Every structure is written in structure tokens, then in C-alpha cells.
Amino acid sequence: IIRFRDTNYVPSNVVISSVSGLPLASVIQIAERFFGDIPVASAVSGRQPFTGYTPRNEIKKYSRHQAHVVIGNIACHAHDPRRYAITLLNNMLGGPAMNSRLNIALRERNGIAYNLESNFQPFSDTGLFSIYCGADETHMPRAIELIHKELGRFRNVRLSASALHTAQKQLKGQLAISIESHQNEMLAMGKNILVYGRVDPVEEIYRRIDAVSASDLLEIANHTLDPSQLSMLIFNNQKTT
């Protein structure tokens, strides 16, 4: 950990992002006061791309009433053009809206999940796609069955033009609301400078979301949600589920 810190936590990997009413000159003055004395250093290149993922299933003993499951797979990296397709897929499957596929299937129709969400996290050379569900232990087998049923729908059923447009419109709306928060905007700008070296206008992001086709969604679903490549971790009171 210390070696990683010393290698990567260097000035060339630092971005100061500010969203405020302060004049730019004041922001620079404050930054120089706190960071101006740090010696100049560059990160040492040499990270090896992640390889060797092997799907696996594990059940862990967990002495609680509620059971937990995480299902996931490796996914697109931060520079993969398919990241917009998987972001849209993720939002439809288990995003924050009440109309996500998993929320409707497990909570609205069956009432068997306390917590339910899916996540996509891209990194520099790989990515992570995951689904989390918390439910009563007796309901967990059914919850897992329903999750896989919804994943199968994404792999096998092409989205209609109207459903695709609705999903794109919803994702763009969520993005518009998120950047109304100065903190969210500040963090997004800093991350984009670190990862891409630029900050794209929100209109460009909208354009890329709108460019995702039903075929793109079908392709990324079959790649990322392939049953043979999914790993699963269960926490419950039983040794078998």
C-alpha cells in the first residue's frame, strides 16, 4: 500500500477542481498556498493491464437475518467506446429510478428485496459490473432466480425504438439533475481531467447516449451478462442456496 501511494500519489496525478463563485485568481492563490511547496514528481508508468479473471461462486456464513448476494463480471474500461451502452444498460437494469427492471421484478411485483441495485465502475484498463440484492434468507433463492431472468431478457430481447428513446431520455435527465449539484459537477470535472485529460460538454455526453442503438445494448448485454462469466458471492446463514 505504501509503495502504491508513493508511486501514484504524486503531483502529476493531482487535479484541483473548483466550482464556486470565487475568481480564478483566488482559486489559484489558495491552491498555491497549500500545494505550492510539494516537490515536482511524475507517476512512474508500468501498470500491467488486468488479466486472469475466472468466474467463481462462493457462499459465506453470515449470522444475520438478512441475506446478501452480489453478482458480477468484468466490464468495459474507461476508454472503451461501449461504456455508454453499458451505462445505459446499467441504468435500465438497476439504476436509481423506481422503474428499473430489477426494482419492478423483485420489489414491486414480488416484494422480496430490501435493497437492490446494479453498478458499473470503469477503471483505466478494466471495469466492474455488479448487481447487489439484500433480502430475507428464505427469499434469496427466488431473488437470484428473478435477477437471472431479467439478465436473460436483456441478452435475448431487442429493445424497441420507443423503449430505447425512453431509457435514453431518462438517463440524460438524471445526468442533468446530478450536475445541478456543485459538488457532483466538481468531482465529475476532476475525474474527467484525470482519466481523459478533458471535460466534455454535457451536450456531447447527451449525443453519445443518444448514439447508443438497440443492437449496441444487445451486444454489450451478451458480453457482460454472459451466465458463464458471472461470479456470485452470497452471505447467509446456510451453506447451500
Q: Residues of each region from the PLM?
A:
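Charge-rich, well-structured scaffold segments of protease-associated domains
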Residues: I1-A43, V69, C76, G94-P96, ...
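His/Glu-based metal-binding/catalytic segments typifying zinc-dependent metallopeptidases
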Residues: A43-N99
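Active-site palm subdomain of RNA-directed nucleic acid polymerases
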Residues: R101, L106
